[in-house]
From Swiss-Prot:
Domain notes: The presence of a 'disulfide through disulfide knot' structurally defines this protein as a knottin.
Propeptide feature: residues: 20-39
Biological source species: Chilobrachys guangxiensis (Chinese earth tiger tarantula)
Protein's name in the database: U4-theraphotoxin-Cg1a
Lineage: Eukaryota, Metazoa, Ecdysozoa, Arthropoda, Chelicerata
Listed GO CC annotations: extracellular region
């Protein structure tokens, strides 16, 4: 009885492992690069820059303290 349960669990584990490997294979055409994901949600020049969204274009998040950072030109 225990051997049967062990064999069934082993087969289930192998089946789940194979399914996970097949689902992790992605095509580069189906994936978005990080700049493309944030394209519509970037922070403009002079606006406060939180950690969640990057500054637009070549702007950098600068300021005297972490709470006072704004998107500015480098």
């Amino acid at each position: 009885m225990n051997a049967t349960i062990f064999a069934l669990l082993l087969l289930l584990n192998l089946a789940m492992h194979n399914a996970a490997e097949q689902s992790s294979e992605t095509d580069m055409d189906d994936t978005l690069l990080i700049p493309e994901i944030n394209r519509g949600r970037c922070i403009e020049e002079g606006k406060w820059c939180p950690k969640k969204a990057p500054c637009c274009g070549r702007l950098e998040c600068k300021g005297p303290s972490p709470k006072q950072k704004k998107c500015t030109r480098p």
